[in-house]
Amino acid sequence: MAKLSTDELIEAFKELSLLELSEFVKRFEETFGVTAAAPVAVAAAPAAGAGAAPAEEVEEQAEFDVILEDAGAQKIQVIKAVRELTSLGLKEAKDLVDGAPKPVLEKVNKETADKAKAALEGAGAKVTVK
């Protein structure tokens, strides 16, 4: 098998859809036993809170999945919203909407997830963020 250069790999990735890239990352992680998640620095507790039990500390979720539960009555508007949020083509976006419940975005920050949820709900879809 020919060895691909970094530039050739980047060009190949540019041609993939968001869902295809997500699947690639999952398989890469499984194959090599690694994770693509950025390391998260744990903030030290203030000295005043030193007596508090560590179980009381609640770690805020950093990555969210936006799940399309139902397209609702305005399916065309939902397909348009999905296309705006992702790099999917018309057929892929339609297949995603028809196959609900399905993830629209995976492992995104809270701000992106909230914006996506608002856009999809504005189009008439039922959406959950996990």
Swiss-Prot record:
It holds the Pfam family Ribosomal_L12_N. It comes from the Bacteria. GO terms for cellular component: cytosolic large ribosomal subunit. GO terms for molecular function: mRNA binding; structural constituent of ribosome. GO terms for biological process: translation. Coiled coil: none annotated. Belongs to the bacterial ribosomal protein bL12 family. Forms part of the ribosomal stalk which helps the ribosome interact with GTP-bound translation factors. Is thus essential for accurate translation. HAMAP family: Ribosomal_bL12. This is Large ribosomal subunit protein bL12. The gene is rplL.
